[in-house]
Amino acid sequence: MLKAVKIALGLLSLGAVVVLGVFWYMETRHEREPSRVTFLDHCASCHTASGGGSDLLTQYHTNDSADELTKRILVQHSDLIKSAQFPEPMVKALALYVIEQRQELPSITNSHAHTIPGHVVESLHHDFKVELITKVGKGPYSIEPLPDGRILLVEKVRGLSVIDTSGKQGALVDGTPQVWPEILQVGGSFAVLGSMLDVELHPDYATNGWIYLSHSDRCQLDCGSPWPISMVRVIRGRLAGNRWIDSEVIWSVDKNKYTLVPDAVASGRLAFDHQGFGYVTVGGKSTYDNLHVMDTPYGKIHRFKNNGSVPEDNPFWLGKQLSDPTSSRKTVWTYGHRTAQGLSTDPRTGKIWATEMGPRGGDEINLIQRGGNYGWPLYTEGLDYNAEYISIGKELGLDFEFSETIPPVVDFTPAPSLSNFTFHNGDQFPNWQNDLLVGSLRAQVLFRIRIEEGKLIEKERLLTKLGRIRDVEMGYDGFVYLLIEHNQT
């Protein structure tokens, strides 16, 4: 008995040390970031407001892209690069750091402040105001406006609730899947296994009342693992008052695909095309060696019929007779994704688009095409967080040409941490019609993106320093609704 107590205490102590170590790492990683340290050691004495040279951080060549500034540094500071023995990717990392400062990108830890402008905001095509509807708890993830003016709200560690037309948030809806408290919270980022994610209405919601939820289904003790594990799952049900009824599982994977990787990279975004097929994003909830294995769900976008059956024209399905029941290949639509945090349908064409977070740089807006390989982790415009090239793809033996991948329609480098988005489709702001309204987390910016014939035409910052914009949706009244994430209770 005494030995068992000692072992238990030892495990608790080890767990406490691990938690404290993770907390310290997350809270201090900005100060330890290699390109920041290198800039302060080698560049700041000249290229800041207090230095003797041009202020790279604010005043000089402010429209440089990362590639352009990298070339400029290589040409103008070749002697320093040689004498300091900068590794090749460090020059690009320095360029990213400089542009991040110009764009006033906060560190992730410091990105949770939020300010609602009290004045009319001027923009290229429309002036507008931002109005507060309601304040919600910590960890909001998604919203879905209803035809009657109410709004469905999902909070990761609380669940589903309804905001009425007066802005009052109701009690949690009874009968939805269980969610679990966070294991760890650092600066507003949650480490959790078993959270609620996205909410989406059936295309014919007005007649059938179906509501789709994605969540991270948690399994413990009876899954062959001594630890809790989780995986993205899609269900649908209806609301009867404040109760969730008629619930049924629409998309899920075998329990042997559940993992210990926290839900922060689960993704779980939902969308429907004009034919009524549903799509769900699954992030890298596994080691990277699984992202290009078709029998696994990770790093992919999956397609299903709205009743949960499998479309027979899915590109990697082998048919009922040949399919392994534990495989998820039957619903794979695209692969090679990192963390697709946004999913939306073009109202003109019914085509599916996605936003994807890169590492340090390489955030993307992608047109989702049947069977497409989106390249991660072999190809990306981003760097690793240690200021090195992303090498994991080569280390895993991935071998395909860039020409075999589908490149992003829009690349964001540096990375603003793109989140969810919508296509503008309403009467209140007609000059934005069909433009993408894209949220971002770290940058705290609402972007307006105009794409024509697959090309970027306009990119505008409609709102800055608003807060971490987790979701963007169109209301039935033609107004744009934003969900701001924060770290307050």
Predicted segment positions?
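Surface loop/turn motifs at the tips and blade-to-blade linkers of beta-strand repeat domains
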Residues: 132-137, 174-175, 190-191, 251-254, ...
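Beta-propeller domain segments
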Residues: 110-123, 181-190, 194-196, 204, ...
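Axial heme c-ligation environment in periplasmic c-type cytochrome domains
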Residues: 52-61, 70-107
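Asp-box/WD-like beta-propeller blade repeats and closely related beta-sheet repeat scaffolds
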Residues: 225-271
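Periplasmic/extracellular electron-transfer cofactor-ligation site
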Residues: 30-32, 36-62, 100-107, 309-327, ...
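Electrostatic cytochrome c docking/interface patches
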Residues: 19-38, 266, 329
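Gly/Gly-Pro-rich "capping" loops immediately C-terminal to redox-active cysteine motifs
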Residues: 33-36, 44-78, 170-178, 291, ...
